[in-house]
Amino acid sequence: MQLSPQEKDKLLIFTAALLAERRKNRGIKLNYPEAIAYISAAILEGAREGRSVAELMSYGTTLLTREEVMEGIPEMITEVQIEATFPDGTKLVTVHNPIH
């Protein structure tokens, strides 16, 4: 199977997000890379579903709470940027202050 670097990146994000989701469901607080992957994967999937950039920017702030991540993580993650594939092309989605 031949994958482009972008496809490999998306698979890595998905794998990390799957691990993060499992840990979150077990009540384990997420660390920095897990939180980034969890939010990024949700944005990528939302784009594939046809949601707009504005919708995803808002949606990204509802995915994790302070109680679901390790101490200090909300302050470390001031924004998440991910290039997502939409029906009309690739766009950069930025989620500001995603963890409340």
From Swiss-Prot:
One GO CC term, this protein: cytoplasm
Q: Where in the cell is it found?
A: Cytoplasm
Among the GO molecular function terms of this UniProt record, one is: urease activity
Question: Which reactions are catalysed by this chain?
Answer: urea + 2 H2O + H(+) = hydrogencarbonate + 2 NH4(+)
Q: Which domain of life is it from?
A: Bacteria
GO BP terms: namely: urea catabolic process
Which InterPro entries does the annotation name?
Answer: Urease_gamma, Urease_gamma/gamma-beta_su, Urease_gamma_sf, Urease_subunit
Its chief place of residence is: cytoplasm
Keyword check for Disulfide bond, yes or no.
no
Entry's PANTHER family? UREASE
How it assembles, according to the record, is: Heterotrimer of UreA (gamma), UreB (beta) and UreC (alpha) subunits. Three heterotrimers associate to form the active enzyme.
The UniProt similarity line reads: Belongs to the urease gamma subunit family.
Listed name of the protein: Urease subunit gamma
Task: Provide the species name.
Answer: Microcystis aeruginosa (strain NIES-843 / IAM M-2473)
| Name of the coding gene | ureA
